[in-house]
Amino acid sequence: MKLLIRPAPEVAIKSKPVRQQQMRQLRQNIRKLLARLDPEIRVDGSWDRVDVDVPDGRSLAGPVIDELVRIPGISTIQEIGVFPFVDLDDVGEKAVQAYAERLKGKTFAVRARRHGDHDFRSIDLERSVGAALLQGSDAKGVDLKSPDLEVRIEVKDDSYHIAHRRHEGLGGYPLGTVETVMTLISGGYDSSVAAYLMMRRGIRSHYLFFNLGGAAHEVGVRQVAHYLWERYGSSHNVKFISVPFEGVVAEIMRSVNHRHWGVVLKRMMLKAAAEIARDYNASGLVMGDAVAQVSSQTLTNLNVVDRASDEVVLRPLIAMDKQEIIRIAKDIGTEPFARNMPEYCGVISSKPVTRARLHRVEEDEANMDPAALADAIANRTDTMVSQLLDSTQTPEEVELIQTPSVDDVIIDVRHPSEEERSPLTLTNNDVLKIPFYELNQQVAELPGNRQYLLYCDRGTMSRMHAGHLKAEGHGNIKVYAPAV
């Protein structure tokens, strides 16, 4: 299978040195990710395209396309057939072979490109192929403005290709072509979408989590960060930094006027984030704020919050409404995480200020013990995001079962996108599909007289959740770990 990849339009209009650098980075990202599927996949290209040659007969088409549509910087992916150029009639014949079935009852338009020295123009090619398709198929007709199907052909010197199928990419810039940032992540809708939008823009992002007091919350946020990285950013290594913020929260509640709690908490986070970001050479901070979504997100309050640091603060969601944010979360697969994420609500005032005054906020902060923030920063931990799930602590040891009995029920806890790519099928056992983020809710509703074995590809997620469920009193939960 041969694929033709076009970069996002913004890449194509850059100056030559910038375009070369961005295309080089895009090829490098594609090559690194596809090599995990098969090291024999070839990735080449030129200034305005990337060519991918996938070995046939290895069932790689689906996995390769699935990987490519999630790589930032790609506009379109076309599955193409490549042929030696003979004449226009031959191009028409090949087009009929490729499109006749799909054109039944549909309108179409031929879009042609030509490179090299030929005795015909691109429009001549379009007309010739269009006539062949009208004669050789049951197409409804030609519609140049809004066709049901576009037939894409490109002639280059003494060869040509016909696009069989076209897939839309993420767009944006290749990851790694813009400076690195630090994204403040809570696992909710806003921060996960903000992190995704940064990656889509080509910005490598570390993840910074402020733990306000819940172990379950950190476990959930680790899963979100790992999912985002694995789906959209795994061409680059990044860190997950966790800051124990319980002491800072307690100090705020002791020393600060309750109306300022929310604003001061954000300022403390920003102060800590700015100091930590410098240690990781991050050029900016990313937050998931949207104007007026909550009381601390008025323009006045955001201005007061930003005065806590000299670092640039990026807010990609600033003008989005909540439904738009949730729609993107659904599209990228983080909505179920956010919907089931445990929340910590210890710093919510009954009458939060909406127009904070900087001098009054600073007067409140002066009452705080600076050691609380310094200790939190000093006691932070960091983990490579690629190792996040491996390093998550399991509260209870759980039994691993290689061969289940016929009465055991297997629970596939993988994310639906992973389960669809590689379904689990067993002959002698019932298999339930319960994504890990819905386990806590659904396990309580299962019959208690059965034994349940949790399953995931690597065994890490299943062991972690089985351990948490066992700690909560579910003694009939174990792990299905088939022999490799």
Swiss-Prot record:
Enzyme active site: C456 (cysteine persulfide intermediate)
Q: Name one GO cellular component term.
A: cytosol
Taxonomically, the superkingdom here is: Bacteria
Matching Pfam families = Rhodanese, ThiI, ThiI_fer, THUMP
Instruction: Provide the catalytic activity annotation.
Output: [ThiI sulfur-carrier protein]-S-sulfanyl-L-cysteine + a uridine in tRNA + 2 reduced [2Fe-2S]-[ferredoxin] + ATP + H(+) = [ThiI sulfur-carrier protein]-L-cysteine + a 4-thiouridine in tRNA + 2 oxidized [2Fe-2S]-[ferredoxin] + AMP + diphosphate; [ThiS sulfur-carrier protein]-C-terminal Gly-Gly-AMP + S-sulfanyl-L-cysteinyl-[cysteine desulfurase] + AH2 = [ThiS sulfur-carrier protein]-C-terminal-Gly-aminoethanethioate + L-cysteinyl-[cysteine desulfurase] + A + AMP + 2 H(+)
Enzyme Commission number(s) of this protein:
2.8.1.4
**Entry GO MF terms:** ATP binding; CCA tRNA nucleotidyltransferase activity; tRNA binding; tRNA-uracil-4 sulfurtransferase activity
Which Gene Ontology BP annotations are present?
Answer: thiamine biosynthetic process; thiamine diphosphate biosynthetic process; thiazole biosynthetic process; tRNA 4-thiouridine biosynthesis
The record, for PROSITE patterns, names:
RHODANESE_3, THUMP
Q: Where in the cell is it found?
A: Cytoplasm
Q: Where does this protein act, in terms of pathway?
A: Cofactor biosynthesis; thiamine diphosphate biosynthesis
* Keyword Thylakoid found: no
Sites binding ATP sit at L184, I185, K266, G288, Q297
Q: Where is the Rhodanese domain?
A: 404-482
Q: Which UniProt keywords apply?
A: ATP-binding, Cytoplasm, Disulfide bond, Nucleotide-binding, Redox-active center, RNA-binding, Thiamine biosynthesis, Transferase, tRNA-binding
Q: List the disulfide bonds.
A: C345-C456
Main localization of the protein?
Answer: cytoplasm
Give every THUMP domain span: 62-166
Q: Does the keyword Nucleotide-binding apply?
A: yes
| Family assignment from sequence similarity | Belongs to the ThiI family.
Task: Report the function annotation for this chain.
Answer: Catalyzes the ATP-dependent transfer of a sulfur to tRNA to produce 4-thiouridine in position 8 of tRNAs, which functions as a near-UV photosensor. Also catalyzes the transfer of sulfur to the sulfur carrier protein ThiS, forming ThiS-thiocarboxylate. This is a step in the synthesis of thiazole, in the thiamine biosynthesis pathway. The sulfur is donated as persulfide by IscS.
- For this entry, the protein name equals tRNA sulfurtransferase
> What organism is recorded for this protein?
Marinobacter nauticus (strain ATCC 700491 / DSM 11845 / VT8)
This protein's gene is called: thiI
